[in-house]
A protein has these predicted regions:
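P-loop NTP-binding core
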Residues: 2-220
């Protein structure tokens, strides 16, 4: 969890206030990745949690040599231990997100079906290009994921149309729709699959997982 808000941590049922070590210690290299891993109640899902100290990590890393590569170095030993390693990033383009992009094999870009999301998309894609050029030439864009879609809203439909018009080959076929059960699940510390596997939100994310796995299978 590379987001100081720690939503991925709490959403997996972990008490953020009780976290003693996590991504902060990992990036400071005071703990190894294996020392910071927590096993969650979701089958086959572990997490390196975030906690409040992560807010300060960008200031503390700024003067360090090769500061953009701290995460890549820290998680390198885990790559053969897991099928997938997901890095949840904050909705900002600071040093923490730069570390995640430098460490990643590919990036999935969520786009809320709202007006300002389109402005942020251009900035993010430019950042990704810079990372590819300077820090991580092997970084691929896995795809653009449209989220919080409501078919009843004109704006939602306009955003989908604009994104597909300009980035058609990059957009996932799966669209994550607005769903009450999706909003409720994190407050119970459960994934949407565990909370309500029959919900529209669960179906959307299962479709995304299948699409992602199929795409990777085709490119291997």
């Amino acid at each position: 969890d590379a987001d100081p808000q720690a939503n991925a941590t709490s959403g997996l049922g972990i008490d953020v206030e009780g976290v003693e070590m996590g991504t902060y210690e990992l990036l400071e290299h005071t703990k190894t990745a294996k020392e910071t891993i927590i096993t969650t109640t979701s089958p086959n899902v572990d997490v390196i949690p975030a906690h409040i100290d992560l807010v300060a990590i960008e200031i503390e890393l700024v003067d360090k040599d090769k500061r953009e590569y701290m995460m890549r170095q820290a998680i390198s030993d885990l790559k053969n231990e897991y099928d997938y390693i997901l890095i949840d990033c904050a909705p900002s383009l600071g040093l923490l997100t730069l570390n995640a992009l430098t460490a990643a094999d590919s990036v999935m870009v969520p786009i809320q079906c709202e007006y300002f999301a389109l402005e942020g998309l251009g900035k993010l894609l430019n950042t990704i290009k810079s990372v590819q050029k300077i820090h991580n030439p092997d970084l691929d864009i896995e795809g653009l994921l449209l989220t919080m879609y409501d078919s009843r809203l004109r704006l939602s439909n306009q955003v989908v149309e604009e994104v597909k018009k300009h980035f058609s080959e990059m957009v996932f076929e799966t669209i994550i729709q607005r769903n009450v059960r999706l909003s409720e699940a994190p407050s119970y510390g459960e994934s949407i699959i565990k909370y309500d596997a029959s919900s529209k939100g669960a179906t959307n994310y299962l479709n995304l997982a299948n699409e992602l796995m199929q795409k990777n299978k085709e490119t291997v």
